[in-house]
């Protein structure tokens, strides 16, 4: 894992931005930082990067979704990122699970809505059969819960 991604995972956005300065970001770093300009460059050069796998088992859409980058998620979906692809690790997280785990409620809702409209499964199950509705309930996000139910999630 790169130093940039490690800093992002630790929640140290300032350090991640410092480390990213002057560096040619890869698709995972660009997605996790929400750098849509860099994402566009990378996807223009190689469209398959929209569904590439990081060493930790995540794809760019999952990273953009988890870190609350609506524009990056929209770009990736528009470029063919798979909305129902589970991570290749023990968690089996899909982008909708990642969106449901975003800290900011408005970003969480916006990304979940984007993914659902693109065909994300509202009943997707990750590790231990955890669903997006369970994530909404856990965070007390009734607005997200209603959105999921409107798109066919089981209550």
Show where each model-derived region lies.
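Ankyrin-repeat boundary/"N-cap" motif
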Residues: 1-6, 22-29, 51-63, 86-101, ...
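Leucine-rich solenoid repeat scaffolds
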Residues: 4, 8-13, 128-155
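Repeat-mediated protein-protein interaction surfaces in helical alpha-solenoids
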Residues: 6-18, 35-44
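Conserved ankyrin/ankyrin-like repeat signature
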Residues: 15, 38, 71-72, 107-111, ...
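Conserved hydrophobic site in ankyrin repeats
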Residues: 18-20, 42, 76, 115, ...
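Ankyrin-repeat inter-repeat connecting loop/turn
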Residues: 49-50, 83-85, 122, 155
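Tandem repeat domain/solenoid detector
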Residues: 78, 82, 117-121, 150
């Amino acid at each position: 894992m790169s130093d940039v991604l490690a800093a992002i995972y630790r929640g140290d956005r300032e350090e991640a931005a410092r480390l990213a300065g002057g560096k040619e970001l890869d698709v995972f770093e660009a997605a996790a930082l929400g750098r849509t300009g860099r994402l566009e460059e990378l996807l223009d050069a190689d469209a398959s990067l929209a569904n590439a796998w990081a060493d930790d088992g995540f794809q760019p859409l999952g990273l953009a979704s988890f870190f609350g980058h609506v524009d990056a998620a929209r770009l990736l979906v528009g470029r063919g990122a798979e909305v129902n692809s589970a991570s290749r690790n023990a968690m089996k997280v899909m982008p909708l699970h990642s969106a449901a785990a975003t800290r900011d409620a408005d970003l969480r809702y916006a990304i979940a809505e984007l993914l659902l409209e693109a065909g994300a499964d509202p009943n997707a199950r990750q590790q231990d059969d955890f669903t997006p509705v369970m994530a909404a309930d856990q965070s007390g996000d009734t607005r997200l819960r209603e959105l999921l139910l409107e798109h066919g999630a089981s209550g």
